[in-house]
Regions:
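A short acidic-to-branched-hydrophobic micro-motif
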Residues: 95-127
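Short Gly/Thr-rich strand-loop-strand
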Residues: 37-40, 78, 119-172
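C-terminal motif of bacterial Sec signal peptides marking the signal peptidase cleavage site
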Residues: 13-16
């Protein structure tokens, strides 16, 4: 499986990124729950557009590869073994995904939402992301975190290794929600602060997604 966040993090560090766009509540950020998205653009309308910390949104095209809409081929391209990853994602029933990032000095937040043909595919993918990020960053994941629904797990990296690419305490969350897999990461001043924001972000993002 791909180590998706780590590769995009490397792109952020290389690009430096501009100051970004201040977060505001746009129609995408206040979308109501309805039918399952029928295409990637409809999925993008359900992804959060601002974050509780107020970090500015990073324009999609300032990242390499760009954030925003993702195809199966895009996500497979994060892997060292693209052909195998394409087969895994196909087996999971991957349809499309969306990435969004917010960044300022010392702070970074990411939200990935991926849609699958079935809840089983989303659950398998979320579990794979959790396992691979845990292997990469170390630590012991919490598979029944307080305050988050069933199907979610979290990982707190209090003192990241220099080679990890993380610059400060970081908290990850991975959730399966119907046919959706949601991955959230927050780099903050402390793991407690990051965890509080992760919990809020997960709740807000899941509230925007239908279960199908």
């Amino acid at each position: 499986m791909t180590r998706r966040f780590g590769l995009v993090l490397a792109g952020l560090l290389v690009s430096g990124c501009s100051a970004g766009v201040p977060g505001t509540a746009t129609p995408a950020g206040t979308a109501s729950v309805g039918a399952l998205p029928g295409d990637v653009e409809a999925l993008g309308e359900l992804v959060l557009t601002d974050v509780p910390s107020g970090l500015p949104l990073v324009p999609d095209d300032e990242l390499e590869p760009p954030a925003g809409p993702k195809t199966l081929d895009d996500v497979a391209g994060y892997s060292d073994d693209v052909e195998r990853e394409e087969q895994v994602l196909t087996d999971y029933g991957y349809r499309w995904g969306w990435e969004r990032f917010w960044r300022d000095d010392g702070g970074l937040t990411s939200v990935f939402v991926d849609q699958f043909e079935s809840a089983d595919g989303a659950e398998s993918y979320a579990a794979d992301l959790a396992r691979n990020d845990t292997d990469l960053y170390g630590g012991n994941p919490d598979r029944s975190p307080d305050g988050l629904p069933d199907g979610c797990s979290t990982l707190a990296v209090d003192d990241p290794a220099e080679e990890s690419g993380l610059t400060a305490p970081t908290v990850f969350a991975w959730c399966a929600h119907g046919p959706f897999a949601v991955a959230v990461a927050v780099v903050g001043d402390s793991s407690d602060t990051a965890l509080a924001e992760v919990d809020q972000l997960v709740d807000e993002q899941l509230d925007r997604l239908p279960r199908g």
